Amino acid sequence: MRFDITPVAKPRQTRRDRWLKPARPCVQKYRTWSNEMRQLCLDAKFFPGDQLYLEFHLPMPKSWSFKKRAKMDGKPHQSRPDLDNMVKSLDALVPEDSGIWHLEAKKYWSYEGYIIIENKDE
């Protein structure tokens, strides 16, 4: 299932993030993103299972030339944010992720940001 929302990596949480008002910008961005993602899943009636396939498509910077964008579209994204932090961001969908026992995750460059999440039931 494709979700048209730009992926966000989960920031490192500190104790201070629980009570600090307003929260740090990266924490505010993540909380907003997680609320939107949760709502998109509810609207689509999508419920993650215990085996997941994830694809994160990150938007290319506007500063890149058209030639470089055309070259990099669909290529693996090998810079920050790290893939493990992208996967951690899906805690918004799965409150108890200890039940997930199989996970495939990839990240790519694309013209616009979106996420593909599929249940892999064999």
Segments the model singles out, each with a brief description of its role:
Residues 1-122:
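Acidic, proline/glycine-enriched N-terminal capping motif
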